[in-house]
Amino acid sequence: MTAVEPKPTTPECVERDERVDAPVVSEISAPPVTRRRRETTWVLAGLAFLVGAVIVGASIGPAGPPGWRVPLALLDHLPLISIDSGVSDAEWNIVWQIRMPRVVLGGLVGAMLSVAGASYQGVFRNPLVDPYLLGAAAGGGLGATLVLTTGRDVTAGWPVDPVQFVAFAFALGTVAVTYSVGASFGAKRNGATLVLAGVAVVSFATAIQTFLLQRNLDVVREVFQWILGRLSGATWSDVVTVTPYVVVSVVVLMLHRRHLDVFRVGDDEATTLGVSVQRTRLIIVAAATLGTAAVVSVSGLIGFVGLVVPHVVRLMVGASYRLLIPLSLLFGGGFLILADVAGRQLMSPAETPIGVVTAFVGAPFFIYLLRTRKVV
């Protein structure tokens, strides 16, 4: 009787079987030329979606030039291009100083949350986790609440925005506490232990936040506006503050795409393939957390982006992180820009919090994925 050759478990041939929650192996891979052409097509589609979202976001607003003139004005301000856009200096200032910072910040936040969500789902082999799993959101919310409830007088004279700074520090600190607690109970050997530690730490941070709000009811509205997510009032200073963290995080996660594919076959198999599981997991979690903490500090808590966007991308291109990370970045950035536009228009002139808009879109879509068993 002839022995059956075991199937290879290389990262390139791992796929997700929709019938069971376990990786299976594909025996046939696309030819290199076909694969490269397919990847190029999807990346160009993602770029087109993002650029289109930027144009829409910059063109819509209660004041300023007519929407159709905004793309011409943007082109007119590019090097070596001269177009008579018909946009006055005052109108251009509205576009450049008010709309564009908001659009760019929305793109950065959406891109970072989507990439971090995809990375968390890969490193923990769990399609239901998001960037807030280990406490970045709860810690950021606690930090912002602490500043808003203790009074601005305490932080008067700080060279940085106190809410953003403390939210960022608390987001990182909470994840560090989660990792320390998880490590003391065996998280180095089992990623599920780290997830459970995250649940405990998040619950504790949320309890402290609730206690502070109960004792300071006069700032509840301001705190909830922050918690529900907002991009209003975004400035180029916010963009400059966040960009370095997002760039570093995305670059690190892009460099670890192959490792994320290896994680999908299990820790033991990853070790067999030469991956240092503990070290690589720590690097990926640290990079995703750094970027998440940075964007949370300026935008508040915006849910479902890091959970749903990676699933949508998987349905389009498959589960390989070779494409999943860059496409999550492009589609996530474009999605959040459009969600912000919707929030501005739904109850104009008032604004709907962007976190509410993403929940309106994300929750039904995720229920659809669960119903059709397409959570991959």
Spell out what each predicted region is.
Residues 2-376:
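Alpha-helical transmembrane segments in inner-membrane proteins
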